[in-house]
């Protein structure tokens, strides 16, 4: 899938996160801002990158503003942002399980 427009998913409420995704031509860039970055930053980034990889996203700018979200919330917000940023949303649901 190719990111064709900017999109948002999530909130800045406690235990949630806001994902901003936009087109980028030269690879994947992930920017993480988190209240718990020193404890969980690498893990949050891994969950987000795994989700992006499973959906075939190789070129995008992804900015995550985390407020202590669980893994399932990170994955859900990344998937939702992607679904809003592509022209045709036909994911392989088995790859997301």
From Swiss-Prot:
User: Which controlled-vocabulary keywords does the entry list?
Assistant: Cytoplasm, Phosphoprotein
Q: Which residues carry this modification: O-(phosphoribosyl dephospho-coenzyme A)serine?
A: 14
Instruction: Enumerate the InterPro entries for this protein.
Output: CitD, Mal_deCO2ase/Cit_lyase_ACP
Subcellular localization, as worded in the UniProt entry: Cytoplasm
Q: Name one Pfam family in it.
A: ACP
Entry annotated with the keyword Cytoplasm: yes
Its cellular-component GO annotations read: cytoplasm
Q: Could you name the domain of life of the organism this protein comes from?
A: Bacteria
Is this entry keyworded Phosphoprotein? Answer: yes
Instruction: Indicate the principal place this protein occupies in or around the cell.
Output: cytoplasm
Q: Which family does it belong to?
A: Belongs to the CitD family.
Q: What does the subunit comment say?
A: Oligomer with a subunit composition of (alpha,beta,gamma)6.
Q: What does this protein do?
A: Covalent carrier of the coenzyme of citrate lyase.
Name assigned to this protein: Citrate lyase acyl carrier protein
Species of provenance: Rhodopseudomonas palustris (strain BisA53)
